[in-house]
Amino acid sequence: MIEADRLITATGQDREEQQDRAIRPLRLAEYIGQPVVREQMELFIQAARGRREALDHTLIFGPPGLGKTTLANIIAQEMGVSLKSTSGPVLERPGDLAALLTNLESGDVLFVDEIHRLSPVVEEVLYPAMEDFQLDIMIGEGPAARSIKLDLPPFTLVGATTRAGMLTNPLRDRFGIVQRLEFYSVADLTTIVGRSAAILGLPTDAEGAFEIARRARGTPRIANRLLRRVRDFAQVRGEGRITRQIADLALNLLDVDEHGLDHQDRRLLLTLIEKFDGGPVGVDSLAAAISEERHTIEDVLEPYLIQQGYMMRTPRGRVVTRHAYLHFGLNLPARMEATMADPLADAPADGE
């Protein structure tokens, strides 16, 4: 899949897990960015500790790579309890969930990543566990089947998802705390890169950290991945120190430009400009033109480009914006100049 091969994908990669664990903050005091979330969670955690109660069930949602797993770990550390981790797709049967719940100690945190992918039958078992700290278990089969209730110790369920809209209403309503993580500012990412470099023992100038941060698409996971690749460049072709010049040379070699766009992003935009006169064009035609699957365009390439204003969806299809032409140093076509006089002509919508 194209996303797994991209340096700037926000999706986690298995080989990075051990490296990320080494630089992951463990306390709210070390947590950089997300000031509103940090302040609220500090308040909720202090209140729960003061009452000697388990923290309310917490839902964390937002784009991938922004620190949902990190925040779950911090919650457990701040509460002084153990963390048990799993993910929605892993919990295939009610018994899988029951095995986890019955092994929790009082106050423990159960972290469920990709919670929107829970199966309906598992979700039904989770409702009474979250609300009443009880587990309903069916024993036997057929006419002899009977239900028994098991009491569970108070625990905190922390659910993480990139697609909060896919959660069912009954599940969403059972979370007492709901937090949305936003993309990070370049200033916060610069601080994160500097902190990670210090932990990894990498001499890094402030300008070098800034150069990495501004190409990281607002995402700490991408920033840390770029840092590791720039480290390799500095080790082989530099003197081991990450300066602005070294970071710029390394990231240009890796084909990540100053706005965080890579070859796939630029190919999509240039195809729209050169082959379809800037659009509008249907997503299937666009997919055929760049030899990619439709879902790859919709789920992998488009979101960041739309968010940054390089392209948009209209009732007639995909079109590039003035911002895309300026990014490539191209003159605006006469048609686009005329369209800009009527801003409603290409009003954003979910066109095909």
Curated annotation (Swiss-Prot):
SUPFAM superfamilies: P-loop containing nucleoside triphosphate hydrolases (SSF52540), Winged helix' DNA-binding domain (SSF46785). Residues 185-255 are annotated as: Small ATPAse domain (RuvB-S). It catalyses: ATP + H2O = ADP + phosphate + H(+). Gene3D superfamilies: 1.10.8.60, P-loop containing nucleotide triphosphate hydrolases, Winged helix-like DNA-binding domain superfamily/Winged helix DNA-binding domain. DNA binds at R294, R313, R318. It is found in: Cytoplasm. It comes from the Bacteria. GO terms for cellular component: cytoplasm; Holliday junction resolvase complex. One of its GO terms (molecular function) is four-way junction helicase activity. GO terms for biological process: DNA recombination; DNA repair. Mg(2+) binds at T69. The RuvA-RuvB-RuvC complex processes Holliday junction (HJ) DNA during genetic recombination and DNA repair, while the RuvA-RuvB complex plays an important role in the rescue of blocked DNA replication forks via replication fork reversal (RFR). RuvA specifically binds to HJ cruciform DNA, conferring on it an open structure. The RuvB hexamer acts as an ATP-dependent pump, pulling dsDNA into and through the RuvAB complex. RuvB forms 2 homohexamers on either side of HJ DNA bound by 1 or 2 RuvA tetramers; 4 subunits per hexamer contact DNA at a time. Belongs to the RuvB family. Homohexamer. Forms an RuvA(8)-RuvB(12)-Holliday junction (HJ) complex. HJ DNA is sandwiched between 2 RuvA tetramers; dsDNA enters through RuvA and exits via RuvB. An RuvB hexamer assembles on each DNA strand where it exits the tetramer. Each RuvB hexamer is contacted by two RuvA subunits (via domain III) on 2 adjacent RuvB subunits; this complex drives branch migration. In the full resolvosome a probable DNA-RuvA(4)-RuvB(12)-RuvC(2) complex forms which resolves the HJ. This is Holliday junction branch migration complex subunit RuvB. It comes from Azotobacter vinelandii (strain DJ / ATCC BAA-1303).
